[in-house]
Amino acid sequence: SFLSRDAGLRGPEPKNNLAVGVKSVIGLDPKVIEERFQVKNGEGAAYAVVGDCTKGIGGGGFLYTNIDSVSAGVVLRLDDLERSGESSSQLHDHFLTHPVVSPLLAGGELLEYGCHLVAEGGASMQHDLVAPGLLIVGDAAGFTLNTGFTVRGMDLAAGSALAAAKSVDLALRNHDVG
């Protein structure tokens, strides 16, 4: 993360350990989501997509349902993206307009759009996690896993945030701060 680098906890990260994620959140009626993704009320669907969605750039696409929206986007290796001359927003739009993806999102309203730099170096990216007044968690701490078949990050971010919160709570209750 920029924060941990600026705090002196780690040096610059090689581009082959980084990816950029571009995501849109598309609002849809829950009944439409259930019908299009063939899920029942209270269920969800998640898809990891490879192939044309990245035009040969390392990475992939994703779709996952929420109660009244669908999150859809791409994650692209930064070094491959830079060499390609494509932009992350162009590839994001290419994925969302793909003939298989666009019918799933048709008629929806764009609620959110965002980009995020993602660490993909796994254990090789982990570094010191604490400094005075600073506690690094989630992907900023290098808690990610991408083997191509398994992609994890949100669960590790949530778990590390919970562990950090418990540690801070304990330190505050024991007056062990300073």
Predicted regions: what is each one?
Residues 116-148:
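FAD-binding beta-loop-beta segment adjacent to the flavin cofactor pocket
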Residues 103-114, 175-178:
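Flexible, glycine/charged-enriched surface loops at secondary-structure junctions
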Residues 15, 19, 153-166:
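Gly/Ser/Thr-rich active-site loops/lids in small-molecule metabolic enzymes
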Residues 1-106, 143:
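Predominantly flavin-linked oxidoreductase catalytic cores and closely associated redox partners
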Residues 74, 138, 158, 172:
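Active-site proximal loops enriched in glycine and acidic residues that flank catalytic Cys/His/Asp
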